[in-house]
């Protein structure tokens, strides 16, 4: 097992590790002034996110979406939290939905109620998540796979397509540098406030 694989999703170790670092979801949120405050508050005062039908639909179809990514990418489903390479980078975290064997290609999976016909119509927070995951894993390419959902007359959520739509997303070093800067500032704020709460400043 790769030494940068920290814990599997849903385990106590996974939750503990995420609280000690900055994940793709967190740094994407923290990339605006209001989002930074919210991300900091969430880190210092974590609360459980209420479950809903959209989230359950996403979980139910995540494995299916990964399995429908062409085999040429060599992607396998992943639920391990991984950290960035190099000493002192253990706090830079990501859980890509899929990885190939040498981590040169990752996958990110989404379900949505709205089509994204072009790359730039993908919500910016998702594009930021992808770039952070590319940074943490060191991958050069992300296969972004998304599935449109529809609602039946009786309120059930079902796939609107027979297969997910795919985008190939390359590394954006400018965005990655911005995300690293944001993540470092957030991590510093988290450490400062935690030390203040413990009275160790």
Regions found by a protein language model. Give the residues of each.
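Charged, glycine-rich intrinsically disordered N-terminal tails and low-complexity linkers that flank
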Residues: 1-60, 64, 68, 72, ...
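Long, compositionally biased, charged low-complexity segments
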Residues: 17, 194-195
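Nucleic-acid nuclease catalytic cores
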Residues: 72-194
């Amino acid at each position: 097992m790769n030494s940068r694989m920290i814990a599997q999703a849903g385990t106590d170790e996974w939750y503990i590790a995420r609280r000690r670092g900055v994940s793709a979801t967190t740094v994407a949120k923290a990339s605006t002034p209001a989002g930074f405050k919210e991300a900091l508050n969430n880190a210092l005062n974590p609360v459980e996110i209420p479950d809903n039908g959209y989230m359950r639909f996403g979980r139910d179809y995540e494995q299916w979406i990964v399995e429908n990514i062409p085999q040429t990418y060599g992607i396998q489903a992943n639920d391990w939290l991984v950290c960035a390479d190099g000493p002192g980078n253990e706090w830079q975290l990501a859980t890509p939905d899929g990885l190939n064997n040498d981590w040169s290609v990752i996958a990110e999976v989404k379900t949505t109620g709205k089509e994204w016909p072009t790359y730039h119509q993908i919500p910016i927070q998702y594009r930021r998540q992808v770039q952070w995951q590319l940074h943490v894993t060191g991958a050069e390419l992300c296969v972004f796979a998304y599935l449109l959902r529809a609602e039946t007359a009786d309120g059930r959520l079902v796939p609107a397509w027979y297969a997910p739509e795919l985008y190939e997303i390359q590394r954006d070093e400018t965005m990655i540098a911005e995300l690293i800067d944001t993540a470092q500032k957030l991590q510093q704020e988290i450490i400062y406030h935690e030390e203040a709460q413990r009275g160790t400043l």
